[in-house]
Amino acid sequence: MGIARILSAVLFLSVLFVVTFPTLLSADHHDGRIDTCRLPSDRGRCKASFERWYFNGTTCTKFVYGGYGGNDNRFPTEKACMKRCAKA
């Protein structure tokens, strides 16, 4: 019975890998992670007012960040945003 469980686990993990592998190669991934430059701006959950920059698909735009939460499409300067997100 122990060998059957091991074989079942190996089969499950193999199927999981085959199903998820194409997603890892999709255009929304960059260096194995979701491309942060495609995420929408996200103010976060708090009420602070920090000036930050996000990439809107064309250029970097200023927005007010609340200080907590949000996503990774948030940069301290326009220059940092353009360096990470602008296509050459």
Curated annotation (Swiss-Prot):
Record site: May bind Kv1.x/KCNA: 39
Signal peptide: 1-27
A GO cellular component entry from the record: extracellular region
SUPFAM superfamilies from the UniProt entry: BPTI-like (SSF57362)
Pfam families noted in UniProt: Kunitz_BPTI
Tissue expression as described in the entry: Expressed by the venom gland.
Localization in the cell: Secreted
Site note Reactive bond for trypsin, residues: 47-48
Main location: secreted
Keywords attached to this entry: Disulfide bond, Protease inhibitor, Secreted, Serine protease inhibitor, Signal
Disulphide bonds in the chain: 37-85, 60-81
Propeptide residues per the UniProt entry: 28-33
GO biological process, one term: envenomation resulting in negative regulation of voltage-gated potassium channel activity in another organism
GO molecular function annotations of the record: potassium channel regulator activity; serine-type endopeptidase inhibitor activity; toxin activity
Residue ranges of every copy of the BPTI/Kunitz inhibitor domain listed in the record: 37-85
Family label: Belongs to the venom Kunitz-type family. 01 (intermediate) subfamily.
Its biological purpose: Serine protease inhibitor that inhibits trypsin at a molar ratio of 1:1.
Annotated PANTHER family: KUNITZ-TYPE PROTEASE INHIBITOR 2 (PTHR47247:SF1)
This protein's name: Kunitz-type kappaPI-theraphotoxin-Hs1d
Organism for this UniProt entry: Cyriopagopus schmidti
